[in-house]
Amino acid sequence: MSDILNKIVATKHEEIAAARAHRGLVSLRDEAEARTDVRGFEAAMRAKIAAGQAAVIAEVKKASPSKGVLREDFRPAEIAASYERHGAACLSVLTDALYFQGCADYLRQARAACALPVLRKDFMVDEYQVHEARAMGADAILLIAACLDDAQMADLEAVALAHRMSVLVEVHDRDELQRALRLKTPLLGINNRNLRTFEVTLDTTLGMLGEVPSDRLLVTESGILGRDDVQRMRAAQVHAFLVGEAFMRASDPGVALAALFA
């Protein structure tokens, strides 16, 4: 694990310990199980692709460790509604506070403002966070292979699937890809950003295409900044995208989405 990932994971364990002291796991799990309003994340993406369109997971993100604040005037509900109007398949909402200036309320606000399925984007290392995700309204979670061993990934996936949530597993290299393929989820994200160096290259996705089984729904993540990037991916039969920074810097994120995928 890179230094930044080690720091983030250590922070997560501290946050979870504090949260558990405030509210027990059983109470949280009961609240999560009581929610029956799961929106179909995978289904929304497959519907876009079946219609010949790009399936865009549009990100609601105020800041990042590498770029700092991306959007000063940050209004999650307005951003979510704009994304929905302009063709997003799903949302991804950052809930990490320390490194991305996110929070659970941002996810709640974004989800309440639209009918799109919502991914809780955070660094998931404990089942407590998965129950927390469903309790706050998330329809899907992200598992980052670089942060987890095989047993942890399988355990967290099982908790999410028990809540009828979708799971997007994120990889960056071939070793992580092979580990991810042992999971049940068909949703596979390839992050074009090296989490050790923060360098971005679309060749990361393109170089692994031949090793991705046809039953997996591949999502390319990071580095999609222009229409030429989109065209390059779609020419390689990659039709699902997770995009954040390019939209967050635009005056109207939804208009930027429509322009990028026109």
From Swiss-Prot:
Enzymatic class: lyase
Question: Has UniProt tagged this entry with the keyword Protein biosynthesis?
Answer: no
> Per its UniProt record, what InterPro entries does this chain match?
Aldolase_TIM, Indole-3-glycerol_P_synth, Indole-3-glycerol_P_synth_dom, Indole-3-GlycerolPSynthase_CS, RibuloseP-bd_barrel
Q: What is its EC number?
A: 4.1.1.48
Task: From the UniProt annotation, give the residues forming the signal peptide.
Answer: none
What catalytic activity is recorded?
1-(2-carboxyphenylamino)-1-deoxy-D-ribulose 5-phosphate + H(+) = (1S,2R)-1-C-(indol-3-yl)glycerol 3-phosphate + CO2 + H2O
Show the Pfam families listed in the entry: IGPS
Query: Which domain of life does this protein belong to?
Result: Bacteria
Q: In which pathway does it act?
A: Amino-acid biosynthesis; L-tryptophan biosynthesis; L-tryptophan from chorismate: step 4/5
**What GO annotations for molecular function exist for this entry?**
indole-3-glycerol-phosphate synthase activity; phosphoribosylanthranilate isomerase activity
Per UniProt, which keywords does this protein have? Amino-acid biosynthesis, Aromatic amino acid biosynthesis, Decarboxylase, Lyase, Tryptophan biosynthesis
- Membrane-spanning intervals of the chain: none
Q: Name one GO biological process term.
A: L-tryptophan biosynthetic process
Keyword Oxidoreductase (UniProt): no
List the NCBIfam families hit by this protein, alphabetically: PRK00278.1-2, PRK00278.1-6, PRK00278.2-4
User: Which protein family is it in?
Assistant: Belongs to the TrpC family.
PANTHER family in the cross-refs:
INDOLE-3-GLYCEROL-PHOSPHATE SYNTHASE, TRYPTOPHAN BIOSYNTHESIS PROTEIN
Q: What is this protein called?
A: Indole-3-glycerol phosphate synthase
Gene field: trpC
